[in-house]
């Protein structure tokens, strides 16, 4: 139970003070109530060891590898047809139910920031466990609990939910493309994901203008996974629905063909549930349910509350004549009947065949003496109304084998899109084929450089005449594309040498090209001189160059470096897919692509969270990168030092100097001038990103640590550690 209101009317006395006990620790008016616009640093301390019961020594990959996957899959398959009295299976098969669970686990993914998806098992927690679109999926997870209980730590909930969906498809006669484990559970709700600003379920303030959807959102309404199946805001207009479908699925990384395959394939199975009006019969969602419900929600008082009386979406009916078996009947029905608008018993808009056609062809889910006509939703008819979708749908109808392959591949992409590179995939069912959306990186096929080689290469890099700024900037630009959300980006693959990254404005393409050309010369010269198959990749050289820059700036420190990166090819790089990794802002380089409604400091925290940084790591990196002159276009904003290119704590010392007074120098209050408090002489200029480390109380507390007279050594040590972390975020081979 998450709605922890005490139902007891009588008030006891506090055993310590004797007063009435009204609230416990953590209750009361919070900082966020007083100052709702305060910077939210809590997203930088998610999923810490304090909330993880497994302990830091636990290795999920090792645990998964000890799993008997074949036996587990058999147990899941046996469950499919083992109908439980407390939640009877439609058509005697839980397969469609588990497909919906898996789909809704993975379907929250959005490509813009890589957040959402199945990767952490978030469907277990609010808000997802209580979204209107996830109604009754609490029962699906409860059905799986005996299996999770049996296999324990060897299988995460995140993996189990997706595997159950795969097993469901296979149990009903469909051949899947494969399955990979490797999704490690977290133990608390995600605070970093922006689901929208609406305060009411199914509201859609996320739209503006000509139905322009707010970034990074993908779903059309608060609490939905994709689109409204009845049509935009319940308007049963198939063509308007197609527009929503296209944008939503594209924002979830699906093209038109994949979209049609997923809709047609997914709706081949199961049915919708709307036996009666949910407003009259269905009670609170899990997060608001009473404590005795033990995590379950949506209690239904209509009839038996389950089986033929189930109320979920409010829509009612099945699409095909064999809802628990793979077939091509969905497309056959979609084009084989003409459809007219009707309403479900719950009052929801849906479609039935005209003139009573199709009557008696669809079995009842629970009563063998009943039968029905097929049902379509507005979102289904969009596949006929939209000319592009219709062409694809008819092609699939005429070419069943092509449809099956398209659905298998699209389902695999849907359920694995947020897992990152194949190096993270676990298990015997991992497909051998490497797919372009997995951002493939060649395997290491050469002997790696050793310490002596590294010393030689460092000397060559220094001899090339790069400035500290050029060396550090290039390495940062390469590595900082990483997103901990969907594990994309990073230095491995050296895609900074390829389109589109090499041309991004934030990377200063002219300067970048100069550095990369020189590094390629060093690479060719070194590799040609080797006689035993030893090679160095550009990816490794770029990171090593950053290490050289920091060592030059810090004088007496060795920056860790681990070779083993390889170089991707342009043909292994989907330009459109990688375009979403281009930073809208990078506060570490004091870069803003344009003016946004979101503040620069909020975008900094967002970027830091995607880089999996803590608040101390964020702070020390900002301080170090500023004095190393890594700013976009060599801007002097935030360069609070007279020793540019030296790794000092000057940024913090000078920011915290009360002898400086700050005033906005632009109407938008994004640039500030720091002047001598007594003379008015201009000393520094800074951005909101710079000044937030003196303004925000938490960040100021951290800045003070590094601004003390005895902190220089700690500052350098902490900076190098945080730097090394960023350089290796995508080195899954080292985990």
Swiss-Prot record:
Cross-link (Tryptophyl-tyrosyl-methioninium (Trp-Tyr) (with M-252)): 103-226
One term under GO cellular component: cytosol
Cross-link (Tryptophyl-tyrosyl-methioninium (Tyr-Met) (with W-103)): 226-252
Keywords linked to the UniProt accession: Heme, Hydrogen peroxide, Iron, Metal-binding, Oxidoreductase, Peroxidase
Binding residue positions for heme b: 267
Region entry Disordered, spans: 1-31, 352-371
Residue(s) at site: Transition state stabilizer: 100
Domain of life: Bacteria
This protein's record includes keyword Metal-binding: yes
The enzyme's E.C. designation: 1.11.1.21
Catalysed transformations (reactions): H2O2 + AH2 = A + 2 H2O; 2 H2O2 = O2 + 2 H2O
InterPro entries hit by this protein: Catalase_peroxidase (IPR000763), Haem_peroxidase (IPR002016), Haem_peroxidase_sf (IPR010255), Peroxidases_AS (IPR019794), Peroxidases_heam-ligand_BS (IPR019793)
Disulfide bonds: none
Gene Ontology biological process terms from the UniProt entry: cellular response to hydrogen peroxide; hydrogen peroxide catabolic process
UniProt biased composition (Low complexity): 17-28
Cofactor mode of binding and number, as noted: Binds 1 heme b (iron(II)-protoporphyrin IX) group per dimer.
Mod. after translation: Formation of the three residue Trp-Tyr-Met cross-link is important for the catalase, but not the peroxidase activity of the enzyme.
Pfam families: peroxidase
List of catalytic residues: 104
Annotated SUPFAM superfamilies: Heme-dependent peroxidases
GO molecular function: catalase activity; heme binding; metal ion binding
Function: Bifunctional enzyme with both catalase and broad-spectrum peroxidase activity.
Quaternary structure note: Homodimer or homotetramer.
Protein name: Catalase-peroxidase
